A protein has these predicted regions:
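Gram-negative bacterial Sec-dependent N-terminal signal peptides
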Residues: 2-22
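N-terminal hydrophobic or amphipathic helices/low-complexity stretches enriched
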Residues: 23-86, 310
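Long, well-ordered, tryptophan-enriched scaffold segments
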Residues: 36, 205, 209-218, 222, ...
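Soluble non-cytosolic domains of exported or imported proteins
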Residues: 39-46, 61-72, 86-87, 139, ...
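Sec-exported extracytoplasmic/periplasmic mature domains
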Residues: 50-58, 75-86, 97, 101, ...
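Acidic/His- and Gly-rich active-site-bordering loop/insert found
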Residues: 52, 78, 253, 301-313
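Noncatalytic luminal/extracellular "stalk/propeptide" segments of secretory-pathway proteins
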Residues: 55-183, 283-286, 293-297, 301-304
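Extracellular/luminal Protease-associated
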Residues: 120-241, 245-248, 310
Length: 313
């Protein structure tokens, strides 16, 4: 889980901030800065990264041997830095229950339309994960709608949905967020609006059945191979509560998206250009799709590692 990595970074972050702070009410004495700087070396930063990324930890999947070893390592490191246990019952750990879902995706995902049919091949053209923590994710005869970036951001006067009813639809979305203006979505800085997690959540709030995010290396910051590897196995998340959920969380290559959009009677380049405006409105695609994904669902327990550094005030 992400928190296991960020926890280890806390002491380093504190150390770095102590060195950088040289003004204001929290001045760091020169002798403390000297000691801190001496301890920040390439070796000190490299060692924990090498260990946590090593094959010995077997990927650190939740509730695995590697997960246990990683937690023990983090606790030992925090203790060596002077932290006190910040977990449950005086220990270092905070228990977290998680749900693992392994989706049995079809080798071909088919779409039918007036301008032709399109078959997307698993891994080559599309990859997906289940949006539900149940034995199957099902989409039946759903229409497709291009919704630009799939963003609702009142503070930027941006709404890609414009009140259009997309319930039960499969939404085709662009990755990232509008980034061509420094005053709009912080320019090139990727905000939460640009993350795939937000896009799936946004679609769920609209009542959509599923999402296909169009992958490009520039918009994602990584090549298609990263999507293939990171979405190709068991996916872990917190247990679902009452929040709305989509059935399927999918990605498609740019080439696959172009074929889909063309079969739906549209041109992807023109849709992308239209999506770069606040006046954009969702564009229905003349396509239908059905898909059933069998899921293997497991419930396991892991933990965060927490340390407390007592203050002097």
């Amino acid at each position: 889980m992400t928190t296991k990595f960020t926890t280890r970074a806390v002491p380093l972050a504190l150390l770095l901030s102590a060195v950088a702070a040289n003004a204001g009410p929290y001045d760091i004495p020169a002798n403390v800065q000297t000691v801190a700087k001496a301890q920040i070396t390439a070796g000190a930063l490299e060692a924990p990264i090498r260990f946590l990324a090593s094959d010995a930890l077997e990927g650190r999947g939740p509730a695995t041997r590697g997960d246990t070893l990683a937690r023990l390592y983090l606790a030992a490191e925090l203790q060596s830095l002077g932290y006190l246990p910040g977990g449950e019952k005086g220990g270092w750990e905070q228990t977290v229950d998680v749900v693992g879902t392994t989706a049995q995706l079809p080798a071909v995902w088919s779409f039918t339309g007036k301008s032709g049919n399109v078959d997307l091949k698993l891994s080559d053209d599309y990859i997906a994960g289940s949006g539900v923590q149940s034995p199957a994710a099902v989409i039946e005869n759903a229409g497709l709608v291009f919704v630009g970036y799939g963003i609702e951001a009142p503070e930027y006067q941006w709404n890609d949905f414009k009140g259009v009813d997309v319930k039960g639809k499969v939404l085709v979305m662009l990755n990232n967020d509008p980034d061509w203006d420094p005053k709009l979505f912080a320019g090139k800085t990727r905000l939460y609006y640009g993350r795939w997690v937000y896009k799936y959540e946004s679609a769920a709030r609209q009542g959509a059945a599923g999402v296909i995010i169009v992958h490009t290396t520039p918009s994602a910051g990584y090549p298609w191979q990263v999507v293939q590897s990171s979405w190709g196995g068991e996916q872990f998340e917190l247990p679902a509560e009452s929040e709305p959920r989509i059935q399927l969380k999918a990605w498609a290559t740019e080439d696959a998206a172009r074929r889909l959009v063309k079969a739906g009677g549209q041109d992807l380049d023109k849709l992308i250009a239209a999506a770069r405006s606040r006046s954009f409105k969702p564009v229905p695609l003349a396509l239908k799709t059905s898909i059933k994904v069998e899921n293997k669902v497991s419930r396991v327990r892991t933990a965060n590692v927490a340390g407390l550094l007592p203050g002097s005030d």
